[in-house]
Amino acid sequence: MIVVDTNVVAYLFLRGEFAARAEAWLRDDRDWAAPLLWRSELRNLLAGYLRRKQLTFEVVREIQREAEALLIGNEHEVDSLRVLELIRDSDCSAYDCEFVSVGCG
């Protein structure tokens, strides 16, 4: 299992300089996981593309659907106390600590 940041998921669907790397990671290990937060983060990222008219609503909707299908069954709720402990013990954001929490089990 690999806990992936939302940006890594986005790289698969938004062609750019990191797309090939994300595709290689997926080929190496298809068991990707993330906290439920990833969905909101991806929607926020896609909102920017939609508002700048870089992607249509139909494309944004399809990216969200495909991304959710990719991670189905591997989305995790996180324990708030564990996340707060990680925040206390690091300089990471609360968002990043959610991903770390999933990776730590």
Question: Language-model segments: what does each one mean?
Answer:
Residues 25-27, 68, 104:
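Short glycine-enriched loop/turn motifs at secondary-structure junctions
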